[in-house]
């Protein structure tokens, strides 16, 4: 241990260590265990982390194979040097559940948390592969909806995570297109009455700094680039006219290992 260093310097040094290594070190002493669970330290460590890329082939795969799907790329230095044959050995915890040992695909990533669908489309699962922590969430109409994980972007050390649900079918379909949001702090879904279903998603969503982005279309067929801001009481929607790319390559999910704790009401998930 770094026993001879001031605590603030020790914390600064440890914040530069990859989260996967910190996870193995957390039982070294009580002080480090507490430090690695401190939201301020976790956020600082996340800000210094290298980004990896998960290749998602959209077919069901066992989560025991998750490590074979990860290609390590440090996006901070990608402009200067990039060799796709070079990777970092990142070993993550597998998803352990005998009833659902496969997921259909990874939906989105936010702060080291992966939002996934199970093969039977009965539930969502939020999963931190670095810590092994999971949270199961009941959801309906998963074949007809798009989901994205995000949070309210504020100056607090601990983010308030949410899941946004939009329909992917036009309004004249028989599908329920009401927008919904899942609050981790309350463990419940609620309908966003103030969000008009004037458009529907036509692409997978991505999350950046807590906000959601995707291509959408209104009922006349006009394509838009949509940005969703997660707010304390719901969401704010901003759109601009844009052309969806004619060709989409393999679906990729960027991923950064982190020590973020999944909250469940006032408790942490297992």
Curated annotation (Swiss-Prot):
Gene3D superfamilies the UniProt entry points to: 1.20.1280.50
PROSITE patterns the UniProt entry points to: FBOX (PS50181)
The F-box domain, residue ranges: 1-45
One Pfam family linked to the record: F-box
Name by which UniProt lists this protein: Putative F-box protein At3g24700
Organism in which the protein naturally occurs: Arabidopsis thaliana (Mouse-ear cress)
């Amino acid at each position: 241990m770094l026993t001879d260093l001031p605590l603030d310097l020790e914390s600064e040094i440890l914040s530069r260590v990859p989260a996967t290594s910190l996870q193995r070190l957390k039982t070294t002493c009580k002080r480090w265990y507490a430090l690695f669970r401190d939201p301020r330290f976790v956020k600082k460590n996340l800000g210094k982390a290298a980004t990896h890329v998960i290749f998602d082939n959209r077919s069901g795969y066992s989560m025991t194979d998750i490590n074979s799907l990860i290609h390590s790329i440090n996006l901070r230095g990608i402009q200067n040097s990039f060799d796709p044959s070079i990777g970092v050995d990142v070993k993550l915890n597998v998803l352990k559940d005998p009833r659902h040992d496969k997921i259909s695909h990874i939906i989105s990533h936010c702060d080291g948390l992966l939002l996934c669908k199970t093969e039977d489309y009965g539930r969502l699962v939020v999963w931190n592969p670095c810590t092994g922590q999971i949270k199961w969430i009941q959801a309906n109409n998963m074949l007809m909806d798009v989901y994205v994980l995000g949070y309210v972007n504020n100056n607090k050390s601990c983010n308030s995570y949410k899941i946004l649900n939009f329909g992917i079918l036009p309004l004249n379909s028989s599908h329920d297109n009401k927008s919904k949001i899942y609050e981790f702090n309350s463990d419940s879904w609620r309908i966003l009455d103030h969000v008009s279903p004037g458009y529907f998603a036509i692409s997978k969503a991505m999350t950046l700094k807590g906000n959601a982005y995707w291509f959408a279309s209104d009922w006349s067929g006009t394509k838009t680039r949509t940005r969703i801001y997660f707010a304390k009481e719901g969401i704010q929607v901003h759109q601009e006219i844009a052309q969806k790319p004619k060709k989409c390559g393999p679906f990729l999910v960027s991923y950064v290992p982190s020590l973020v704790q999944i909250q469940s009401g006032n408790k942490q998930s297992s």
